[in-house]
Swiss-Prot record:
This is 4-diphosphocytidyl-2-C-methyl-D-erythritol kinase. One of its GO terms (molecular function) is 4-(cytidine 5'-diphospho)-2-C-methyl-D-erythritol kinase activity. Pathway: Isoprenoid biosynthesis; isopentenyl diphosphate biosynthesis via DXP pathway; isopentenyl diphosphate from 1-deoxy-D-xylulose 5-phosphate: step 3/6. Catalyzes the phosphorylation of the position 2 hydroxy group of 4-diphosphocytidyl-2C-methyl-D-erythritol. Its EC number is 2.7.1.148. InterPro entries: GHMP_kinase_C_dom, GHMP_kinase_C_sf, GHMP_kinase_N_dom, IspE, Ribosomal_Su5_D2-typ_SF, Ribsml_uS5_D2-typ_fold_subgr. It comes from Shewanella piezotolerans (strain WP3 / JCM 13877).
Length: 284
């Protein structure tokens, strides 16, 4: 009997509505406070369960990533090892999110793989345990697994649900790849922002502690920020390179997008406090 394809598992992008770096731990990781919100712009994954433990990935990406570095295959393998599952999967990735953009695409792909295969393999591993598996793959993976907008502390794994407004965003994608590792290793990165309560942070102006450093080193990011500020309050997400502006109405965001310089790319997407992945999981 041939297993059916399970289609259309979304791996949504996220925005860091603010990002504060509070210090550096002895293990090299950074303490931070950040506010994650999903947007309705996604990669998509399809899965076919196999009756052996083989894992195979197909992708529309032009750049080939080695299997041992690919977060999707690492996620599937981690789930197999954790559960002792004797099934495998053939996976198709429709990559739509930019790489190295601060939108969390790789982490989101890994999270969708864990959530989908947990369901398709019939493992029924609780979400909190699944998030622990995901944390070993990357600090941003748990928020995608939990599936709600969240205030995050620690290295990003301590999550508290929040429900900020869900506006429309214009996301500008500069033609540059920013290395998260290089930014966090840069001695010029601010690491002493005081910690504040969530209530205080929600009432204060939002900022990204990485933005000034990235803009200094990446003229493309600085140019995108300067252009977007003409139309809306704008910030960088994560360690960049993507920047976003907030709009009340979809048409306002689309009107700004229509004026985007030809040297830049961008898209319009709605904020979402519940991940599209959770809506897909509910269909199973």
């Amino acid at each position: 009997m041939t297993a059916a394809l399970s289609l259309g598992w979304p791996a949504p992008a996220k925005l860091n509505l603010f990002l504060h770096i509070n210090g550096r731990r002895e293990d090299g990781y950074h303490e931070l406070q950040t506010l994650f919100q999903f947007i309705e712009h996604c990669d998509f994954l399809d899965f076919k369960v196999t009756e052996n433990t083989n894992l195979k990935l197909h992708s529309n990406m032009s750049t080939v990533v080695a299997d041992n570095d690919n977060l999707i295959l690492r996620a599937a393998k981690s789930l197999q090892e954790y559960s002792q599952c004797q099934q495998g999967a053939e996976i198709w990735l429709d990559k739509r999110l930019p790489m190295g953009g601060g939108l969390g695409g790789g982490s989101s792909d890994a999270a969708t793989t864990l959530v989908a295969l947990n369901s398709l393999w019939g493992l029924n591993i609780p979400i909190d345990e699944l998030a622990k598996i995901g944390l070993k793959l990357g600090a941003d993976v748990p928020v995608f697994i939990n599936g709600f907008s969240a205030f995050a502390e620690g290295v990003g794994e301590q999550l508290q649900p929040v429900y900020p407004p869900q506006p429309w965003y214009l996301v500008v994608v500069p033609d540059v790849h920013v290395s998260t590792a290089e930014i966090f290793q840069d001695p010029a990165l601010p690491r002493n922002t005081p910690k504040h309560s969530l209530t205080s942070l929600m009432e204060s102006p939002w900022k990204n502690d990485c933005q000034e450093l990235v803009a200094k080193h990446s003229p493309q990011v600085a140019k995108a920020l300067a252009w977007l500020l003409e139309y809306a309050p704008s910030r960088m997400t994560g360690t960049g390179a993507c920047v976003f502006g907030q709009f009340e109405q979809e048409q306002q965001a689309k009107d700004a997008l229509a004026k985007l310089p030809t040297s830049m790319n961008g898209f319009v997407a709605k904020g979402a406090n519940k991940s599209p992945l959770m809506l897909r999981l509910a269909q199973c």
